């Protein structure tokens, strides 16, 4: 990535790289070097009438310029997964609404993923009213999509990843300010990350059983939109009082988390979401907020983040925060207006929908998704 920045700064069309000058294991270094260069080169320009032609020639010489085939396959899969995530996040809201998003996931069947799409009729039958309530003000449909990858011959428990897919978030009746609302196309970044991950696992034929679950909605004001004060019943059977329709991501995740735990009985669940602005106040764009009910899983995610540069910082969960989301009229409310701790109370809310003590972690990635840097 740094070398790519160097290239952009110097604006030369051709570079020569001598692999013999590298002291580290070149078979490890070269693959990562080229992978980082490719990731940094990503541009989303499909709506530009005139596209820049920034072709650079990089010649690798020396006796240590080979990359093992298995590493080539792995890096290519990682690249395609990451680029697919970026493409989804970069699409404008008028293009990638929930109907279109769900359709785009169907071709993933061709690479070995089992795709199942639950439309509003199926979701209503299942009782996923917290998810459905978020999208009821939109003319677009709401969906839950499951993506299964079976890389092991046995029936071992899968790893589960759940993503928030609010394709555009106006805030609903609790309308957001106009300034920067255009960035709310990124409010589906958690779901896009899960989709990219599942695509990468399938392309590299990963030896693991995994499932990705994404809730796809559009949060719009309208004659049928959810109102502050509404009470809805979740898939879990727990009821939620909606105090603010702009605290909608947790409502989408609530049904998705319970369904994932109940249907797949996974080893663990990791959910990813642009859930709160409060996490940006706390951590900026350098760290994702990590909340977990399991120390082992938390440590694994922290270690993985340090190795890859995708850093996380563990934040607190504690029963003492429960009073901030308890409701007088329902089992809980979707936001608290006093007491602060916005990111923690959001995670505390999600934890209530993990019913069987499954190891679970919540990654609040708002800082990364909305970063301008």
Regions found by a protein language model. Name each.
Residues 1-165:
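Short amphipathic alpha-helical segment within the helicase RecA-like ATPase core
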Residues 12, 85, 99-373:
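A generic structural signal for tightly packed, nonpolar segments enriched in small/aliphatic residues
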